[in-house]
Amino acid sequence: SLACGLAVRALQISGAALADESLFTGNLWLEAVVLLAASPILEEYFFRGVLYGRCKELVSAPAAAFMTAAFFGVFHWDLVQGIYSFFMGLILAYLMEKTNTVKAPVVFHFAANLAALVLEVF
């Protein structure tokens, strides 16, 4: 519980959503690099690699998946994006649990971001 609480507090202090918004300057290539590479790697190593693992030490895997998915949704701030991110977080936690590696969630997250970018551009 302490680790989960500290993670939420760290997200609040960091102003993560504001930092993400400042990266999107209209430069498509910069946005693509951030969206497709940096975000999946950093977010998955934190949310699934660190937070999910710590929460699983304290609660069951389904409860840890729900908690980290909720944090993942809140991290994305916008209501619609937050709801989508919550359900995405459940899928990503499932992948982490089944494969016992953060690689699968990173690849899935990358693919989801790529699909979103393609839909936005075209």
List PLM regions with ranges.
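Juxtamembrane helix-loop-helix connectors linking adjacent transmembrane helices
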Residues: 1-39, 53, 57
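Transmembrane helix-loop-helix hairpins at the membrane interface
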Residues: 28-122
